Amino acid sequence: MATDIATRRFNVREFHKLAEVGILGEDDRVELLDGQIMILAPIGENHRTVVDLLAELLTDQRKGRYLVAAQNPVLIDDEDEPQPDLVLYDRAAIGRHPTPTDVFLIVEVSDTSLGYDQRSKIPVYASAGIKEVWIIDLGSYCIQTYRDPYTADRRYATTETHDRKSLVSPLAFPDIRVRLNDLVQ
């Protein structure tokens, strides 16, 4: 006879408490998704390089319009606090974790985490109404863009895949142009 295994779900307050009391360490690579503590893959050299170069490019072009955060949390709701690789968000959120209404763009860099990013994180971002998400797929060397969230269906209406030579621009800042070839060696 099969027995179902129960899981313990956490809210954001409890998740933060685990860090405060030392159960989760400062260097632990974890995030809260759908009330579950997810252990993130270690950051590889290619992943780190792309995040660093993209953060530099986006920071250089910001002109005071937004802030860039690398691998910092976004407070989605009481059960979701993911740590995207990069976030472009409104300057009004200085001093706190950005929330979905503050976010212009989320970028996930996927070296070994493509399935997790597509199946677990994209639905959370869509349900929160995050307007735009990019997944930079280092396995296929492409940028997948997700736009026009359907919150009830936890998906995006518009998805496109751009090859490494294509120029991609965030919806909120069409003057910014990103080419994957400029970020990978």
Model-predicted segments: where are they?
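Gly/Pro/Ser/Thr-rich low-complexity, intrinsically disordered segments predominantly at protein N-termini
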Residues: 1-185
